[in-house]
């Protein structure tokens, strides 16, 4: 149950999706195991994984409050297969669940493990200040976290998550896949709507006024090199991503939001992400945060029926990244 009685339980909605993923492990090319007391699902480290696994993992990340589909047509003509994300509750789905806001590191051992946790487990632990703004907590008895990682979480991380959620390790499922994998790259591109919501939050737009949202971005081909793989998934969104938000706001606020969301607002816009990353010597904190946004935004005011646009697609930069 959620502590906010007007909001659904993310884990109650995502739970059946997790169990379905586990049940279909063989056909999705996943490896399910028990490690350090928790259930783990390898979706792309030692397992081959699949695009379909990535699509379904993305829906788990959304806490069961969104749909993710692969469409045969998209905004970038030369890369037509597109990840399409829709949520009728994008604030809770994207910020309350999908956003990778929980830093998890092996603080007790020497494994060097580090990953950002996303998914409905965040809403049980509520270790992030964001949940005070959302006014949401999910009092679930089982939960799941998705990790962008090439290995299962060590015991210290499992125990940290168990302590924060108040659940026994056996009641937590960790789903993990590196960016270089089919599933990993797919679930990252499926964050196209989430980064728009994050930008709306960053610029101070009233989140309660965001009613619905749709996003799309080209399905990036995986790459065995981590930097190249990370670059491709980012470029899919930064230069090929498009979102439409439906807001209960007046025209001036809708127009301003459409202008504020896109990646074109960033001083770092204009080069493939791997090139930008190399330019700052691999220091994420030196990259302008405004870059992590979709290329184009459409914001529709349901009050007036008018729509406003900002940003632009850069298909040539998608091509430069993907080839």
From Swiss-Prot:
CDD domains on file: MCH
Database matches in Pfam families: MCH (PF02289)
Keyword Hydrolase: yes
Catalytic activity, as annotated: 5,10-methenyl-5,6,7,8-tetrahydromethanopterin + H2O = N(5)-formyl-5,6,7,8-tetrahydromethanopterin + H(+)
Entry GO CC: cytoplasm
Similarity remark: Belongs to the MCH family.
Protein's name in the database: Methenyltetrahydromethanopterin cyclohydrolase
Source organism: Methylorubrum extorquens (strain DSM 6343 / CIP 106787 / DM4) (Methylobacterium extorquens)
Gene: mch
């Amino acid at each position: 149950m959620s502590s906010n009685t007007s909001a659904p339980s993310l884990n109650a909605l995502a739970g059946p999706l997790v169990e379905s993923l586990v049940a279909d492990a063989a056909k999705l090319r996943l490896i399910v195991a028990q490690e350090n007391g928790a259930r783990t699902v390898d979706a792309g480290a030692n397992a081959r994984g699949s695009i379909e696994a990535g699509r379904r993992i993305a829906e788990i990340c959304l806490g069961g409050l969104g749909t993710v589909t692969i469409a045969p047509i998209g905004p970038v003509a030369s890369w037509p297969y597109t990840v399409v994300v829709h949520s009728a509750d994008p604030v809770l789905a994207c910020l309350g669940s999908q956003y990778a806001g929980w830093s998890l590191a092996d603080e007790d051992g020497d494994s060097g493990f580090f990953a950002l946790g996303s998914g409905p487990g965040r809403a049980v632990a509520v270790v992030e200040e964001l949940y005070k703004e959302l006014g949401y907590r999910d009092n679930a008895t089982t939960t799941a976290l998705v990790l962008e990682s090439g290995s299962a979480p060590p015991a210290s991380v499992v125990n940290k998550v168990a302590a924060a959620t108040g659940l026994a390790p056996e009641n937590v499922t960790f789903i993990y896949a590196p960016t270089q994998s089919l599933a990993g790259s797919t679930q990252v591109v499926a964050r196209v709507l989430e980064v728009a919501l994050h930008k709306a939050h960053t610029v101070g737009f009233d989140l309660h006024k965001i009613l619905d949202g749709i996003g799309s971005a080209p399905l990036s081909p995986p790459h065995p090199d981590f930097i190249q793989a990370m670059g491709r998934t980012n470029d899919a969104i930064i230069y090929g991503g498009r979102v439409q938000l439906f807001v209960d706001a007046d025209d001036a606020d809708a127009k301003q939001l459409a202008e504020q969301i896109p990646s074109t607002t960033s001083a770092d816009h204009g080069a493939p992400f791997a090139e930008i990353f190399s330019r700052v010597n691999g220091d994420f904190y030196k990259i302008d945060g405004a870059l992590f946004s979709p290329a184009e935004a459409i914001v529709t005011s349901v009050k007036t029926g008018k729509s406003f646009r900002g940003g632009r697609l850069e298909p040539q930069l998608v091509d430069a990244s993907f080839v």
